[in-house]
Amino acid sequence: MKDDAYLKCVNPKCGLEYPISSTNVQCDNGHVLDVKYKNKPPTKLKETFYERRNSKGSIFNESGIWRFRELLNFCQIDTESIEECSKFLVSLDGAEGRQSKPYQMSKAAEFLGRNTEGLWLQPEGYNPSGSFKDNGMVTAVTHAKMVGAKKIVCASTGNTSASAGMFAANEGIDCDVYIPAGQIA
């Protein structure tokens, strides 16, 4: 999926497109942009993701998010090259998602009247900042790093700011957080 990513306006009536290297967060008409891919991922990736559950010493295979890096390859890198992953992908030694593996919750399933093997929960509190926001923020800071951003700005009352600040600091990028008056979590 190399050379596959681009930005596209989420408004179907607009549909403006931009290169992935763009720093735009909105299209020229003021609508939000989303990362899109020209091609669908090959079905053989399921096997690759399954095999990566046994990390084989790669921090990017341990990571909850970068284990699926082919689906998030907006950096357009060789996803099997540890050197390229280390250079471009933001990671705290694979800690994001490492401990937050899903657990089978048989007592909760019984309480809900569901099949005891059908309910799995993933404790996101094990992420480095203690927040579920780490999964998305690691990709946001990777994109910021890719486009050469000097600063990340977010509005948050808690989880987003903790995650943004932590990953930005790890990459040497300034981070400004704006909190609405009287809205601290």
Report residues per predicted region.
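PLP-dependent amino-acid enzyme catalytic core
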Residues: 1-185
